[in-house]
Amino acid sequence: MSKRQSSVQIRQLFGPALRSRISPASSELETLSPPRLSPRDPLGDMYPEESRGSGGVAAVDFLEGTYDYAAPNPATTPLYSQSSTGYYSAPLETNGPPSEGSLQSLGSGPTSPLVFVPSSPRLSPFMHPPSHHYLETTSTPVYRSSHQGASREDQCGSREDTCSLGELGAGAGAGGFEMAKDTRFCAVCSDYASGYHYGVWSCEGCKAFFKRSIQGHNDYMCPATNQCTIDRNRRKSCQACRLRKCYEVGMMKGGVRKDRIRILRRDKRRTGVGDGDKVVKGQEHKTVHYDGRKRSSTGGGGGGGGGRLSVTSIPPEQVLLLLQGAEPPILCSRQKLSRPYTEVTMMTLLTSMADKELVHMIAWAKKLPGFLQLSLHDQVLLLESSWLEVLMIGLIWRSIHCPGKLIFAQDLILDRNEGDCVEGMTEIFDMLLATASRFRVLKLKPEEFVCLKAIILLNSGAFSFCTGTMEPLHNSAAVQSMLDTITDALIHYISQSGYLAQEQARRQAQLLLLLSHIRHMSNKGMEHLYSMKCKNKVPLYDLLLEMLDAHRLHHPVRAPQSLSQVDRDPPSTSSGGGGIAPGSISASRGRIESPSRGPFAPSVLQYGGSRPDCTPALQD
């Protein structure tokens, strides 16, 4: 009997445990065996072939040894298939993986695509006796990554030959691994979120609570100090604090994910029948046409295209939805400064937050109906004239449900006494708190707030021609048309709120009168910020610095450059060719010169794509 036959018998009798003791014989076997397969050979050559007989017995040839095992009835579930089961080959020894040459193509005929998964110690090797053969089920965890998927695609030759977790079944390990990445928590109580409700991820309980609260006139009162802890176990203990936290995290009526809006529009276009659906489809057609015209604008500074598109054709309901969808998120300061604050730390916190909010404010303005159709000069002028008013009304709205508190960010909530550390800050805090109290008394609605915020921006350039140092708007008629559209949307919403005719007119006047108080606060805040800049007590960021200097230095030198030269906004925010982009304010003015930056220094908004704290928030 040859050495080769004797070695095969030894392996069958004693198993792979003795392989390390017969290494000389193994070296001779390698010289007698067929040539090793290349790693680049097709995947089918790396696996044993199947020959299924009619008698219900399948044979697998491996290393010139034949092992029979019972095959199931063809009428039942197949023994293995492309999408349910895969072979898992084990090493010939328990101390290391098998070599690539130890697997050979035995037999002929077509082979089902199999996925090669490295074996683990709990898998039985093929070299065991026939009773020890196993076919692993799909409950074995298979973790796929983009790199692994690409390599398998290269081996199999097509994407259809690769296995996916969905095809392999709902395995416990794989399912848990995939779901772990997609697990979201309620922004209000930190319970598991059931979906995206009213603008934030929330659970079913908080969604239903917020729905009940905004539908009725619920005047909740906190029995304590309006600072109750709202979590999974204590969310029902205080309705007032729960509703306050809902507003703090950004819940609002009509808050819908943008991708959901697109899905709803598509479904309506597909299934809409009847007169009512035809009207809705007609309105959607106008909106799509409007968006298409907005995206087709070229980089000529907007071209003053207000006359090319009538914004008044958009219905009031659609205007309200656009305004609510344009709202920026609530930011985090991410500043680790200990209390009590000093003058320097307080101003550092506030200026840092203002600089972050300015970037989001520009993205918000670009989403307003008709704003991108204005010339670049008009866009810059409106933003420079109203930026602090817009930031202040946003601060007041966030603080409306927190008496005595100003919510600058989710992790930066200040009260009146904390403003004492900065000279002149207490007066500004008092005015902000008084206006927030007025908002609370009027029970300002989210729809009314977004309209007032847009009116502040568009009304800021109405009297620019009165100043000798400021160039007037190039297309004041287009700005006035946008302002009328927003005002009509506000009047329409008030008329649908159930007020009597006289009460409607009174409420319109009450809301619009608030804007004069906000303008007064803005002027006070601008003077205070400019005095702090002159004292060099706190460094100002480039964007905030240029916005501040825009109120002091207004001497136009050259016409706005084309947007193609100055648009460096992130791809997600460059939705229109005529919009404000990083660097556009300085480029359009050509006049910002301050003690901290020369005339040729990097301009105002050039951080749009490079600042990590703002890039995620600007994505659509």
Curated annotation (Swiss-Prot):
Gene3D superfamilies: Erythroid Transcription Factor GATA-1, subunit A (3.30.50.10), Retinoid X Receptor (1.10.565.10). Residues 315-551 form the NR LBD domain. The keyword Ubl conjugation does not apply. Residues 1-55, 88-111, 286-308, 558-620 are annotated as: Disordered. The keyword Transport does not apply. Keywords: DNA-binding, Lipid-binding, Metal-binding, Nucleus, Receptor, Steroid-binding, Transcription, Transcription regulation, Zinc, Zinc-finger. GO terms for cellular component: chromatin; nucleus. Coiled coil: none annotated. One of its GO terms (molecular function) is zinc ion binding. SUPFAM superfamilies: Glucocorticoid receptor-like (DNA-binding domain) (SSF57716), Nuclear receptor ligand-binding domain (SSF48508). Residues 252-314 are annotated as: Hinge. It is found in: Nucleus. Residues 1-185 are annotated as: Modulating. GO terms for biological process: cellular response to estrogen stimulus; estrogen receptor signaling pathway; regulation of transcription by RNA polymerase II. Binds DNA as a homodimer. Can form a heterodimer with ER-beta. This is Estrogen receptor. The lineage of its organism: Eukaryota, Metazoa, Chordata, Craniata, Vertebrata.
